[in-house]
Amino acid sequence: MATRTHASNELSETLQGEKVVLKGWVQRRRDLGGLIFIDLRDRTGITQVVFSPDVAEAHALADKVRSEYVIEIEGTVILRTEDQINPNVPNGKIEVEATRLVVINTAKTTPFQIEDRTDVSEDLRLKYRYLDLRRPVMFDTFKMRSDVTRTIRNFLQNEGFLEVETPILTKSTPEGARDYLVPSRVHEGEFYALPQSPQLFKQLLMVAGFEKYFQIARCFRDEDLRADRQPEFTQVDIETSFLTQEEVLEMNERLIQAVMKEVKGIDIPAPFQRMKYQEAMDRYGSDKPDVRFGLELVALNDVFEGCGFKVFADTVAQGKQVKSINIKGAADKYSRKDMDELTKFVGIYGAKGLAWLKVTEEGLNGPIAKFFDEALAAALIERMGAEVGDILVFVADKASVVAASLGALRTKLGQDLDLIDESQFAFLWITDWPLFEYSEEDGRYYAAHHPFTRPFDEDIPLMDTDPSAVRAQAYDIVLNGYELGGGSLRIYERDLQEKMFELLGFSEEEAQAQFGFLLEAFEYGVPPHAGLAFGLDRFVMLLAGRHNLRDTIAFPKTASASCLMTEAPSEVSPEQLSELSLAIKPFRK
């Protein structure tokens, strides 16, 4: 085989008359009455190669090649005639006149066409993932992913950060999701866990005095999957010592600006918008709001207190909430049947109903309009900024149901009404989170983020009297309605960390067994430290305009956490189980 001289994207009319050697895959072959044309594909693009009967040996071989054959061609770059120019490809003004053809390898007929547009099932694509990855759109996504990680590394190293790898085989600790467990052959009956995050190790690196750490970290969580979750994923993990929260946010803003400029050619203004957790929930019904469009939630308790509409008045009297969204100018777009469908939709999120009113020239119109006297209607219209042609939708329930149902409805309406500018990247910090979440079902508190998050110093006394009122020095970075990542200032005193464990239901013995190494480390001069981690897979998904996390992971798992290509997970031999002192309980498939 000859040495390849050029890739497809390196060919242009400036090379007219030059001899080149190209290698790649046959995308398409066409026989046009003597002349044979082959579209040769490599990872950079497609080049048209023409075979003339005058070059008999190469022409005869070209007649036999089929799609996805791997070939090598030698030939001369020539200009296409004016009527043959293809404006849809970068090198569409030239073609290569072949003088030699070598078939490096043949190929079976592929189970689907290797083209960007394919309507085959995702399962078939995942089974033949190595073929799916040949599609240019997939290569472009992974080229972008590589560019993102390169930019991140360069930025952080220039900022003085050290890239440090932390263990993959580690100790099982309660961090929220279930651990993936790895049995130890050497220590019978004992297990390692795959890390859900490098959280404890990166804090210990701050104890060690490293001050600035980062890692492109592999993480594992055995949890129920959805479109934007995978059992194994990659996060950009960062930890620093001696920085304030504002300094951490500012540094990460500059990191994101660098990525957006390098990878997308977009200048993102900073500082990013900041919004406290409670404000986000009040205005958007979500802790990760998409702020590219309006449709904000409006609180109406004061409007409906003691009003003639008993459903709303009773809700207010019970200490619950009534909120509304004004769908501007949508009265003509939603029929009664459409509103019934929206009512079913909010029911998924616990709402018992969706009340609605249309604003007409004659006043309010809809199923509940008869309960609104002139004064109440005027007060509502003023509060909602309503005009003729608007629809007002209402949910009345406890705060969590109102937020969940109207927050989800807001997102649906934004999509259905085409209100979202898909070209926009709206970054947002959500700050001042609650430190704890209380589970009525379990009758206990859980950490809203993780057990190592630092409370506001002025809220520490509330840990003994009103834990639900304690605010966390935590921050999430949100992009276009997706939680991109999050971080916090950390606890760095042993007594405060022990108090945190106590409130989370750990006995002193349990805390020592699970986290004794961390508690002891906190007795050896620990600096204040803070950090952040964001999901690389999700970041690339959003930058690439993809809608599925699996499209940004080379060999992903399905929604059932299986690999259709390798058929993992799979059974192992009795001998392997015996070595690990394991036995499988009988079960039904």
Curated annotation (Swiss-Prot):
Entries under SUPFAM superfamilies matching the protein: Class II aaRS and biotin synthetases (SSF55681), GAD domain-like (SSF55261), Nucleic acid-binding proteins (SSF50249)
Lipid biosynthesis recorded as keyword: no
EC number(s) reported in the record: 6.1.1.12
GO cellular component: cytoplasm
Subunit structure: Homodimer.
Similarity comment text for this entry: Belongs to the class-II aminoacyl-tRNA synthetase family. Type 1 subfamily.
Protein's job: Catalyzes the attachment of L-aspartate to tRNA(Asp) in a two-step reaction: L-aspartate is first activated by ATP to form Asp-AMP and then transferred to the acceptor end of tRNA(Asp).
Name under which the protein is recorded: Aspartate--tRNA ligase
Gene that encodes the chain: aspS
